[in-house]
């Protein structure tokens, strides 16, 4: 600061302004949050309110990250950039084949090709549990996830727990007793189907099941982990390993 450094931690937002004070709390290695107040929260009659946000460090300075809110995403492994998906057979998209054997296609006007839909493939999927795997993202239904806050399930510092389901279905990501990752046909609200999602200090995310079947209490140790290029599992969180880190990409 003496030499002209410094960076704004947080400015005004669409519905709040006047950020003040800064309280840093270290949850875990690479997991930090800050408390502050808004002088005026427009959703709360313009009153001063307390707020909590993750801390992201950039060039040695803390800046406010974003509390995860859910939505439709593909879930990217920081390790290789591959996507979390269902272990199902790959189904080709419906389109007219192109190649040297069909040269007159070049005389036809170009037209958009529709994305593959859930209805085109869901009947090819098993009806019971389907394990998860990691593979290159191809914008297919078995790679598209809806992440939804479950306010009635409790939470952790900064957020409620979330359910993670295949978009357009009730099929839910779940932890297993042997510390693996599967999907169950329908979300039931069981603790192993609830997920803690936190932004890390480098901007990536940690994803942890609320509970692991057969283990007592709330899980505070094991996270979704990329054990290899194609194998998601549950393992002890390690901030120094990209295997513990994920990104959320809107589609």
Q: Residue ranges of each PLM-predicted region?
A:
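Hydrophobic core segments of beta-strands in well-ordered, beta-rich domains
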Residues: 25, 31-40, 76, 163-164, ...
């Amino acid at each position: 600061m003496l030499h002209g450094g410094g960076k704004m931690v947080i400015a005004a937002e669409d519905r709040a302004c006047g950020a003040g004070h800064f309280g840093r709390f270290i949850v875990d290695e690479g997991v930090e949050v800050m408390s502050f107040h808004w002088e005026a929260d427009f959703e709360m009659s313009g009153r001063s309110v307390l707020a909590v946000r993750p801390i992201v460090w950039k060039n040695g300075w803390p800046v406010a990250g974003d509390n995860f809110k859910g939505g439709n995403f593909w879930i990217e492994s920081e390790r290789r950039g591959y996507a979390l998906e269902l272990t199902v057979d790959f189904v080709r998209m419906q389109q007219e084949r192109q190649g040297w054997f069909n040269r007159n296609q070049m005389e036809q006007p170009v037209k958009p090709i529709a994305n593959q839909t859930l209805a085109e493939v869901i009947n090819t999927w098993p009806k019971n549990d389907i394990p998860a795997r990691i593979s290159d993202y191809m914008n297919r239904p078995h790679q598209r996830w809806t992440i939804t806050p479950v306010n009635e399930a409790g939470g952790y510092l900064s957020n409620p727990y979330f359910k993670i389901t295949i978009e357009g279905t009730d099929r839910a990501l779940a932890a297993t007793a042997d510390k693996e990752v599967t999907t169950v046909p329908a979300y039931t609200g069981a603790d192993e189907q609830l997920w803690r999602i936190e932004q890390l200090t480098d901007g990536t995310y940690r994803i942890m099941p609320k509970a692991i079947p057969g283990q007592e209490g709330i899980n505070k140790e094991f996270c979704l982990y990329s054990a290899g290029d194609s194998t998601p599992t549950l393992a002890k969180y390690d901030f120094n390993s990209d295997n513990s880190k994920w990104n959320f990409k809107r589609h």
